[in-house]
Amino acid sequence: MRNLLLSLAASMAIAAPALAGEARLEARGGVYWEPGNTQATAGAAAGYDADLGTGAFLGGEVSADKVLEANRRTAFGVTGRLGLKPSADSKLFAAGGYTTKNCALCEDAIHAGGGYEQGFGSRLYGKVEYRRYFTKNNAPDGNAVMAGLGLKF
């Protein structure tokens, strides 16, 4: 899995100069919950969004997130984003991807969700996002709501 994530990140870095868009780095935190358990979460993400005309974009990101609870480990993810740009400084998007398991007895997951990103000047942005984690083998599905603060390049 680590090789897949590194390959995707390298591909995004190589393709970035040929695309019209922006790279981004963010720190984020929020709440993760599953039946009977709610915990804080913190993480970081790096991504690239390419413009699809003036009103839409397509992007991808790699991420590392940690549920702040004993016996949890960092979950790594790869996510695609597709969205609209309601204004020059805002993005409304749907997202989906894959996340590694966040504990020894947990399951990896496919995730789907959506969010809103708002620019504050030319480089700073804030973001809120919801994700649903669909697990397998009858493991409980998880949910997360996160807020992030990042820089655009």
Where in this protein do the model-derived segments appear?
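Cleavable N-terminal export/targeting peptides
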Residues: M1-R24
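Gram-negative outer-membrane beta-barrel domains
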Residues: P17-F153
